């Protein structure tokens, strides 16, 4: 909207009498990319911008985006999913483990040669980011599961863990254990950390309180995420402070995650026609989440591990119909093991 206002002001002042006026609609692909990757609620104007931006992106006018889409093996028209989970992570990867300016250079590329070269570099940085992230996540899980945990938090640190991935790892630990997660990289001169929270715990308030206690040198954030710095000799004190803070607000009861369901569905009702109907409600994202439907009276005919810890299931319904299903990155979790050992059981 700022660009629209500036454009209107320039027009009113006669600037475009001597300069070509840009067609702002042609830039909506970048607006859509930024809106989705910044997790802006897809409501009102933002939803309209993303919906139209995806149409512009499908026209492949931006040479850099076109190259990145092709290098990412996206063969269908881009969706909000592709922006948030395929293209966005590749652009962000160069800032996490490479050169932050490369993402901007790609989006401003003026030749196909330059665009393809930069897209290849972004893909390489993204692969590197995945490897670093997997290593830090593995070490963090080993620490957490290698000893009893006194507090309802996931609190881990390691020497020279890459700062570009600790936020991602914190998010995955939060999802895995359903507790607030704090992940820190111990550097030569200070400790830098990132945290992710669950409902009911305001991380921003926690960080402010810790700074007031002299435990952190820097820090800030909002309810669900925060970043901070501290001296290494304050790690134990900060862990105790954060643990007591969370414990006092959650109480002694075990945290039980809540899965909200939008509707029930039989296996025979899971059809391409239904998927097409639901696609009319896109773009999905923050503020307009995809419908979550629960399959009832399902028999797991077969379950097996595929890829990097994914579980593929073959399901059948009591009134006919069969479908394939995939559960991503859960093979080593309690749910993954339950699926793999289901033995053809019927689930209501």
Predicted stretch roles:
Residues 1-16:
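Active-site cavity-forming subdomains of large catalytic enzyme subunits
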């Amino acid at each position: 909207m700022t660009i629209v206002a500036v454009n209107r002001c320039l027009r009113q002042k006669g600037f475009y009498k001597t300069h070509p006026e840009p067609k702002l609609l042609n830039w909506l692909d970048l607006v859509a990319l930024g809106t989705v990757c910044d997790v802006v609620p897809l409501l009102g104007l933002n939803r309209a911008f993303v919906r139209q931006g995806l149409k512009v992106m499908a026209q492949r006018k931006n040479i850099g985006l076109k190259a990145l889409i092709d290098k990412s093996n996206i063969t269908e028209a881009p969706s909000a999913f592709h922006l948030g989970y395929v293209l966005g992570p590749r652009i962000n990867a160069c800032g996490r483990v490479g050169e932050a300016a490369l993402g901007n250079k790609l989006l401003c590329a003026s030749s196909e040669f330059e665009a393809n070269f930069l897209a290849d570099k972004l893909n390489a940085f993204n692969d590197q980011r995945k490897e670093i992230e997997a290593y830090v996540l593995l070490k963090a899980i080993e620490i957490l599961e290698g000893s009893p945990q006194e507090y309802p938090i996931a609190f881990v640190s390691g020497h020279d863990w890459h700062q570009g991935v600790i936020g991602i790892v914190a998010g995955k630990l939060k999802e895995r254990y359903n507790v607030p997660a704090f992940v820190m990289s111990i550097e030569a001169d200070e400790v830098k950390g990132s945290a992710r929270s669950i409902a009911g715990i305001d991380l921003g308030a926690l960080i402010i309180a810790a700074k007031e206690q002299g435990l952190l040198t820097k820090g800030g954030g909002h309810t669900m995420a925060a970043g901070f710095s501290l001296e290494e000799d304050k790690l134990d004190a900060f862990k105790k402070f954060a643990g007591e803070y969370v414990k006092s607000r959650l109480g002694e009861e075990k945290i039980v995650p809540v899965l909200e369901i939008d509707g029930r569905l039989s296996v025979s009702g899971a059809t391409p026609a239904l998927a097409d109907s639901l696609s009319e409600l896109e773009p999905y994202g923050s503020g307009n989440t995809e419908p979550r439907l629960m399959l009832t009276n399902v028999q797991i005919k077969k379950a097996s591990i595929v890829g990097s810890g994914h579980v593929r299931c073959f399901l059948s319904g009591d009134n006919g119909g069969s479908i394939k299903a995939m559960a991503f990155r859960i093979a080593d979790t309690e749910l993954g093991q339950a699926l793999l050992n289901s033995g053809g059981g019927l689930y209501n």
